[in-house]
Amino acid sequence: RTLDCSDIDHHLGKAITSSRIREPISNNDIRRWAHAMHYPNLLHYDPTYGEQSRYGKLVSMQSFPCAVDDGMGTSPACAGRIPNSHLLFGGEEWWFEDRRVSGGDWIFNERIPFDYVVKETKLAGPTCFQRGDNFYTNQHGQPLAKQRSTSIRYNAAAGGQNVDTSQFDEPEWSDDELEALEERKLGWIRMLRALGHDKRWWDDVKVGDQLPERVFGPHSVASFTTEWRSWLINT
């Protein structure tokens, strides 16, 4: 099998269109994102805590800018037609500026397809790994973050032949397993609350230290719904 990626070449290095937000960011937009990402930092949803911080107000998580994008940051990694193909999201890289978003701000995104490469995979033979960049700025033109997303594009028929149907069944969790999982989650939350407004420096962590793990899941209809509604394109 071959994979015709020639149409992608026409899009590389050229900005693609995007659907801009119609209203400024609100505090509840920021809260919904923190909720969806299971991130218990009071800085992103408690106004009193935010006022006591170095920011003096409630501010967003660093990853929040992608919540305003109508393609969730993936669009520049999907530009171009590959006939008879399917696509998987392959992850992303982030570069953050020391600048946060707060209520009243606007976020804009310039989306530019970056590059692609075709490699042989066990999944589907010739497989296209395509990357695209998102450049997020505020209403002052100041950069907020850069997000580089990767898509995995492959022949649909070839990929379907290699699907492992034994993994289709959903796992079942007992009450005891869920309770133990919640206790593991609380360990990280307690650490975050104990730190408060203090900073954790490099020297505060030593080789061999046992650090609390950040656990979230398992996903459910409720958790997926919470995440879906946090994207501004859905509100």
Task: Identify the residue ranges that each predicted region occupies.
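Hydrophobic beta-sheet segments that form the core/acyl-binding groove
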Residues: 90-140, 208
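A structural microfeature
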Residues: 145-147, 212
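Hot-dog-fold acyl-thioester-processing enzymes
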Residues: 1-91, 158-235
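Residue-level signal for secondary-structure boundary sites
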Residues: 117-119, 142, 157, 221
